[in-house]
Amino acid sequence: MVDTDNDDLKSSTGSIGDLYAQKSSPKGGKPFHILGLHLKSKGIFEAYEWSKWWEKADANRKKILAQATQIRVKFLDPFLTDSTTSSPLIVCGDINDGPGLDACEKRLFGSGVERLMRMIWKPQLCLGNALFDTLSAKDKEEVDFSSIYTTTFKDPIFNDTYQREWIDHILYSKNQISEWVTGGQIHSKMPDGTPIYTRYKHASDHFPISVDINT
């Protein structure tokens, strides 16, 4: 249970259990670890009275924040500060949350992915974001993430309008001297240019993300 918004009420993290980072030893490179995540969905796909809808939306977001906080405090910080485990670390997966301040995030003063990425009092433990690194200098300066999205869906609340969301991330530790994670890409098409969803009708509605890793 975690107090996500300083209201003296604690939100359940659900079942996180033990977390383990898988060690990978690439040929010709130094070992690094990978932690794959899939946090609570924030989607609501049923009709509710408006105040009830907001209640459910806020509850989902609080659970994501609680899960992200537990992972940051109970796994990431200990892992990155332990001399026996402080090798390069990738944290990736469907975080089900993006950076920025949408309506719910304004109400809760934060997002799950930002909670995973940083603890402002421990800047040396902050994680980089591979897709943010690909933004133009102007978009970085203005903190404009609108060009990045990893899934699209019909929003039943707004007459099935297609929404674009950035909820899948590849984060990386900054405990290396050189840049070791580069070339972030979102893949919406097959190598021959065919959209993935037209080739594979039952594929995930999330686009694959890739990076180049050089340890």
Per-segment meaning from a language model:
Residues S12-S15, K23, D77-I90, I95-T215:
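Metal-dependent phosphoester-hydrolase catalytic domains
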Residues M1-K42:
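Structured beta-strand-rich core segments of catalytic domains in phosphoester-bond hydrolases
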Residues E55-S83:
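A long, amphipathic alpha-helix that forms part
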Residues K42-K62, R115-M117:
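A solvent-exposed, charged loop/short amphipathic helix patch at secondary-structure junctions
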